[in-house]
Amino acid sequence: MKKGQSILGILFFTLLFGLCFQQNALNVEAKTRVIHKDITPKEAASSDLKVIKKVTKLAAHRWIQSYTMDSKYYYYIQMTSPYTGNLRITRVKYRGLGRYIKDHMDLKKFGHATNLDCSVSNGQTWLWTGSDCKGNDVSRAISGFRYQKNKTLRKHGTIHYKIPDAKSKKYMTNVYPAINQNSTQMAVRYTYGGKQYYQIYNLAKGRFINPRNPVKRICLSATSGDFQGFDLYGTSIYTIEGSPRKSF
């Protein structure tokens, strides 16, 4: 998800990067804030945020799993029903209050869509999410692809990477990507051995990483929350979690 959203049921981890490379887990400082409510809190009187009008319905009838945006469009990703790793992306371009253009594309056998992000290079937007699902391993790779109206992609995108753990060298499953604000780095999150890891890669031309050569590898203990997504911004990683039955 892109930058600066206030979200219900959240557990923020601010991860301070240090000198950590492939073989060493990074020492981090975790800062948390938990909201124990199931309803959206009222905005403060001083807030400039106001819901004026509902704008559009999305192309699928399930919860939004994640979303991202570039300078022209918003992209929302949802599971489709019945769920077998199939996803749908709705692209929305707003043209003023109550006016918009909407279309969609489908992703078959991709996974759970825990994270959707985008990179921009030479004026081209590349969307990134988990892919290559199989059984309970909802994503065994990450994929990058250009948005194409009414197009269906199967299993993975134009570019896809399997992600090995930098220490064990084993390929990881349940992998999710996030891109920093200037499309120069990618973070990939996965769980392994009861812990959660984030590997940071240099991103060339908004598309290319060396999956065996992360510039940082961060390790955190497992948390009690239900992981919902994360983002990479500057030198920090922000995660969002909630309880399975009460988050959104």
Q: Can you name each region flagged by the protein language model?
A:
Residues K57-S71, H112-W128, S168-Q185, D226-G234:
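Structural signature of eukaryotic scaffold interfaces centered on beta-propeller domains
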Residues A166-A222:
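Hydrophobic, aromatic-enriched interface-forming segments
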Residues T80-V92, K134-Q148, G193-N202, S243-F248:
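Structural motif
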Residues L220-F248:
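Loop/turn-rich, solvent-exposed surfaces of beta-rich toroidal or solenoidal domains
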Residues M1-E29:
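Sec-dependent N-terminal signal peptides of Gram-positive bacterial secreted proteins and lipoproteins
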Residues V55-H61, H104-K109, H160-Y171, I218-T223:
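Surface loop/turn motifs at the tips and blade-to-blade linkers of beta-strand repeat domains
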Residues T32-T56, Q65-K108, R245-F248:
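Beta-propeller domains
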Residues S46-I52, R140-I179:
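Asp-box/WD-like beta-propeller blade repeats and closely related beta-sheet repeat scaffolds
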